[in-house]
């Protein structure tokens, strides 16, 4: 069907005060509420990184949340998005925290 929305995949990295503030847990909750799949994890350089996949409008909602909202006690300085592309099918069945 041509009415089906295209699926998008995007990688992200969030900079600021995003570790030790429950950022990953809130990201997982928000992703499940919005209805996207992928993953999130802390990096050794103090950022949070991951990947989001889903219908384009839902991925855009998650990108906005990762750029502006975050967890209640986080401070997002900037969020970089990369490798944004259209995919034919989702590569994950849910959204998870990686360690």
From Swiss-Prot:
Residue positions, PTM Phosphoserine: 93
Classification via Pfam families: Acylphosphatase
Domain of life per record: Eukaryota
InterPro entries: Acylphosphatase, Acylphosphatase-like_dom, Acylphosphatase-like_dom_sf, Acylphosphatase_CS
Active site: 24, 42
Positions bearing N-acetylserine: 2
Enzyme class: hydrolase
Family: Belongs to the acylphosphatase family.
GO biological process: phosphate-containing compound metabolic process
A Gene Ontology molecular function term of the record: identical protein binding
Keyword list, A-Z: Acetylation, Hydrolase, Phosphoprotein
Name of the molecule in the record: Acylphosphatase-2
Disulfide bridge map: none
Record domain Acylphosphatase-like: where: 9-99
């Amino acid at each position: 069907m041509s009415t089906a929305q295209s699926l998008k995949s995007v990688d992200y990295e969030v900079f600021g005060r995003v570790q030790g503030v429950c950022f990953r847990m809130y990201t997982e909750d928000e992703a499940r509420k919005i209805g996207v799949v992928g993953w999130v994890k802390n990096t050794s350089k103090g950022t949070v990184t991951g990947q989001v996949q889903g219908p384009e409008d839902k991925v855009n909602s998650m990108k906005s949340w990762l750029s502006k909202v975050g967890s209640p006690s986080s401070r997002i300085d900037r969020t970089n998005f990369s490798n944004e592309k259209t995919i034919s099918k989702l590569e994950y069945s849910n959204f998870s925290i990686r360690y």
